[in-house]
Regions:
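Residue-level signal for glycine
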Residues: 30, 92-94
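Short coil-to-beta transition motif at edge beta-strands of beta-rich domains
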Residues: 76-89
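Short beta-strand-centered aromatic/proline hotspots
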Residues: 96-105
Length: 262
């Protein structure tokens, strides 16, 4: 697992006088932390993908960091899709996690100081840049739906506080009552993730197809990752970010229609 160290912080207050801080972390970084100065009324803003269709399989978000800077910020324009992680926090609570988007460096640095906008995407959005890799080099095997789901979440490298999964499907009423994880026994051939030219799907496409099959919506919201079943009224598994343990949460943990950041 990759380690990230904080390289920049951006503290600011909202219009409602709430204190927030943006932490920009660099993969493998162990140096000193510098404080940035925010620009404008909204140094950090979040936008969630909008879709009027209730059963959309994924709804991920983007964010923008606005700072007053000079040429030392050139390093933030990375070609690596998970090189700079961004955690947006209220107090000690992460309310958004993602990465600075890889893009070409185009800012004009002729002035001593300037306003700079840095574009970010939520952690799950970075799966667009990660191709599916088969389990073994020799041949394509069968893989469980649980392996696919957990692999995609872990590959996102997001600092999610928890992962919510609906307790919906089971082989039998007895298995449902016993909280058996049916996704562990549901398998699919890896061949489905490669086209006729053997080109792989990316992991964002994989999680999207998985959610279509299960009739779920995957959404990152207020620091956690949710797999929402719009028609579910029962319990949700609340997993730790590494899927090592879970607790139960009552139904209706999140309404897809009400997703927004204030």
């Amino acid at each position: 697992m990759s380690n990230y160290g904080t390289i920049y912080t951006l503290p600011f207050k909202s219009r409602r006088n709430k204190s927030y801080i943006v932490e920009i972390q660099k993969e493998g970084y162990t140096g000193r932390v510098a404080e940035l100065t925010g620009s404008g009324d909204a140094p950090f803003s979040i936008e969630i993908a909008d879709d009027n269709f209730l059963y959309v399989p994924i709804r991920f978000s983007t964010a923008t960091i606005r700072v007053v800077g000079n040429d030392y910020l050139q390093s933030l324009y990375s070609t690596g899709y998970q090189q700079y992680r961004v955690n947006f926090k209220q107090g000690d609570t992460i309310v958004w996690t993602g990465f600075i988007t890889p893009e070409l460096y185009t800012q004009d640095y002729t002035a001593t100081l300037f306003d700079l906008e840095i574009q970010c995407v939520s952690a799950m959005n970075t799966l667009e840049y990660a191709d599916y890799k088969q389990k073994s080099a020799g041949s394509k095997e069968f893989v469980s739906l649980w392996e696919l789901l957990t692999r995609c979440v872990l590959e996102s490298r997001g600092s999610y506080s928890a992962v919510y999964i609906p307790h919906v499907y089971a082989k039998s009423p007895a298995d449902y009552d016993a909280n058996a994880n049916v996704l562990q026994s549901m398998t699919i051939s890896e061949q489905n993730f490669f086209d006729e030219d053997d080109k792989p799907m990316n992991l964002k496409e994989v999680i999207e197809e998985l959610c279509k099959f299960l009739n779920w919506t995957c959404v990152d919201y207020k620091g956690a990752l949710y797999f929402v079943d719009v028609d579910q009224r029962g319990n949700y598994y609340k997993y730790t970010p590494d899927f090592s343990s879970y607790t139960f949460e009552a139904g209706n943990v999140l309404s897809v229609q009400d997703i927004h950041f204030s």
